[in-house]
A protein has these predicted regions:
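Conserved, well-structured core segments that form or line functional sites
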Residues: 1-176
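Short, basic, low-complexity termini and linkers enriched in Ser/Thr/Gly/Pro
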Residues: 138, 173-194
Length: 194
């Protein structure tokens, strides 16, 4: 089931945790590639000094102020696209960075593998855009979720750099059954192409 706007129209930290175990799906040509989301980071509002929105709205971050369920894509180091999904109420700037999915760790590697560029910026997460997130019925136990500070945000100062807003799965080899999908490997973290 494709996640609708209602799923994302909630507080960022709640959505962040709930995204673990969901599937990021990208349509490339006539194929769909699906990867289970394994690592995410929350950026929550004006007060979050690690957030692009901390100093207010700019042309670069304006999508963070829009409706939930839109993608926020930006470039770092001149060549890595970062994939975020906007959460919460309109005009409250919050977004979630998708750092890992499937066997891919690292947000730059993920967007490169899925051919996600800045043309997805401000697009809705749905089939029409060619990029969306699905719930395939996997329930992740809280015992299998670890929270740590976000990566590379020391510029935010001691308090915000230490906020435990990064969520990831502790155990990478989980056994699930998918009656509808064919897995190319015994583990859910592998790529599904159908």
């Amino acid at each position: 089931m494709i996640l609708k706007q209602k799923f994302f129209n909630r507080p960022a930290l709640k959505v962040t945790e709930d995204l673990l175990g969901k599937f990021l799906v990208r349509k490339i040509g006539n194929k769909e590639v699906a990867l289970m989301i394994t690592e995410v980071e929350a950026y929550d509002g004006f007060q979050d000094k690690a957030s692009h929105a901390h100093r207010g709205k700019t042309k670069r971050n304006e999508v963070m102020f829009s409706e939930a369920g839109r993608f926020y894509i930006y470039l770092i180091y001149g060549f890595h696209n970062m994939l975020n999904i906007v959460t919460g109420k309109k005009n409250y700037p919050a977004a979630i960075l998708i750092r890992g999915a499937g066997d891919i760790s690292g947000p730059g590697r993920l967007t490169k593998f899925l051919k996600i560029g800045r043309h997805f910026n401000n697009k809705k997460a749905n089939r029409k855009s060619g990029l969306w997130i699905e719930d395939r019925g996997i329930k992740i136990s809280k015992r299998n979720i670890k929270r740590t500070p976000r990566i590379g945000v020391n510029y935010a100062g001691k308090i915000w750099a230490k906020k435990p807003y990064r969520f990831f799965l502790k155990q990478k080899k989980l056994n699930f059954q998918f009656p509808i999908c064919k897995l190319l490997s015994s583990f859910v973290f592998s790529v599904i192409i159908y």
